[in-house]
Amino acid sequence: MLTQEKITDALNDVLVPGISRSVSDMNLVQGFELQKNKVRISFASTALSESAQNWIGEKTREVIKGYGKGAEVEIEFLEKRPAEINRIENVIAIMSGKGGVGKSLVTSLTAIILNKQGYDVGILDADITGPSIPKMFGITLRPQGNDSGILPVQSANGIEIISINLFLSNEDEAVIWRGPLIGKAITQFWEDVLWGKLDFLLVDLPPGTADAPLTVLQVLPVTGTIIVFTPQDLTTMIVKKAVKMAQQMGKAVLGVVENMSYLYVPEINKKIEVFGKSRGAEMSLAAEAPLLARIPIDPELALLCDEGHIERYDSEVLKSYGAALATVIPASNKLH
């Protein structure tokens, strides 16, 4: 005999074609009605091709009949915009006033940590003219979708990713756009991508305090920021501008991360501060937020990024960063 609990369990087994998440995880289930052994299920057709809709319909009938023999299943698809469906608990912007400090690296490592902790995580690459997220994750697939929405591409471990580079014919093709077009692209990535249910959406920002960061902080419901910097005096001076931008726009600074903090040489068991002494305490004081991590210059990490296997990286530094993150992120808002 069919029950509402059995139907809910069955729908968790129906995966969305092109992405290894269920129709429930993508929040495509709009409701269902159960009368005795007959069930009527409503799905959103957002970002789904006709063949994908047909597949979901067939798979749904198959799994529900497995829970209740002789069950009658009616299915309908409703038009919905991604913005009506997405349920994203936390949006965290990774920012810095300076270029080349490793925002994309910190964004990726943060996503990997949260993913390992069991959260559903996505990355919105807002660095429209200099995207590097797909390269680090080894992603080359073009996002699927249609006029009703776009499906993000998943990493090997299930992190959802959207980036302008995934839409280009060649990865080294230049995106020569002025500010308004960049702002529009970021807004579309937020409103037109079917993210589904996410615990965290991390936004990788380009350097500076102009159009792109402004669009993200004004348009997206940012719940917190992480500031990235390196030890150089010139860098920390510029990065403080990003701290002030976040503060002036009422966005909480969750913490600061010092990248390229040192080089560890195991042969002599020594940390060499290549770019000078750590400025973690100084930046923590300026941001009024904790120092979450000091990420070293690590040849292994650099190689994994170049090879597109950043998710294979594991180190004590990463574990320490994860423990620090757990003290500042709103873990109580976990959806699953």
What are these regions (language model features)?
Residues 213-234:
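Inter-motif core of Ras-like GTPase G domains
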Residues 114, 118-171, 176, 183, ...:
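Phosphate-binding loop that captures ATP/GTP phosphates
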Residues 17-41, 79-80, 295:
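Short edge beta-strands and adjacent turn/loop segments
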Residues 2-4, 26, 45-59, 63, ...:
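C-terminal lobe/tail of nucleotide-utilizing enzymes
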Residues 91-125, 239, 243:
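Walker A/P-loop phosphate-binding motif and the immediately C-terminal alpha-helix
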Residues 11, 29, 88, 99, ...:
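Residue-level signature of catalytic and energy-coupling elements of molecular machines
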Residues 83-89:
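Phosphate-binding P-loop
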Residues 145, 164-180, 187-215:
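Switch II (G3) loop of P-loop NTPases
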